[in-house]
Amino acid sequence: MRLYDFRTEYRENPIGLTEKAPRFSWKIESDEKDTVQTSYEIKVTDENGKLVWDSGKKISDQSVLISYEGEALAGETFYSVEVTVADNHGNVESVEGSFETGIFNQTEFKAQMITSDFSEDETACPIFGKTFAIDKKVKKARLYATAHGVYEVTLNGQTVGDYRMAPGWTSYHNRLQYQIYDVTEQLAEENEIAITVGNGWYKGILGFYCQPNQYGTQAGAFAELHVEYEDGSKEVIATDETWAVKTGEIRYSEIYMGETIDTDAPEIKEGKVVVKEFDKLSLIHI
């Protein structure tokens, strides 16, 4: 018997979970005929090695979406999971995995939704940016990001993550999805973060009558970088009025109308960052 495909909330070793009682799933395979699971035991430990939940041995063939029932999970914390399973042939095997919690309460975000003072007629994509220095050894770094529009983040010139068309299309006034990225290895002593935002579904041309501005008239960015250092200290770098904004080589961008890029000599226009009114309770993690 072998255990495989262990998942927490449908994902393999996820980060940024906001579920306070995450669910665990796994699969079994065996070369023996008519093999079935007869029991399982789940143990969860925190990043300090403390046991926070031991399910005890459960006589059950259930292996899908088993809910965590231990002590309250801490936010932004790494947890290890071990599942031990027995089958009807007397075999006992284990599988390990992990998950990391995120920010449970949206009001704890320090970032602000920022936009620019560019006119509504400006077709070039705004690029929101900030430079910052790090002078201590980094333990881990997580970037929370979303936008009014569709966004792409670069950190020190490298694209962050593999999402495309993030954060996705929702009823933006009610729900705005955000993504979380592990950027630990991308940080250096001197850093530059840049967020390019296209119109997307938020401001872009949609519908039978090809009308823009279905949800708003200004594209915006919302991001928060959480850095934890080896000495235990933490730092948060969040979008606010101290960021800069400019246009770049993407001169026009529409999901259904195409994109124009000028790589030769784009007309760079610098603007002023404007903080936009935004309800953080609409934020949801996917």
Where are these predicted regions, by residue range?
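Conserved small/polar residues in nucleotide/adenosyl-binding loops
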Residues: 284-286
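Accessory beta-strand-rich segments of carbohydrate-active enzymes
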Residues: 26, 64-66, 78, 87-89, ...
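Recognizes extended acidic, P/S/T-rich segments that occur
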Residues: 28, 35-78, 84, 88-93, ...
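Extracellular/lumenal ectodomain signal focusing on beta-strand-rich modules
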Residues: 5, 39-41, 70, 82, ...
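Extracellular/lumenal carbohydrate-interaction signature centered on repeated Trp-anchored short motifs
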Residues: 16-18, 73-75, 185-188
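Non-catalytic, glycine-rich low-complexity segments
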Residues: 1-34, 97-132, 214-216
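Short hydrophobic alpha-helix segments
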Residues: 6, 55-56, 96-97, 163, ...
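Long, charge-dense accessory insertions within large macromolecular proteins
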Residues: 274-276
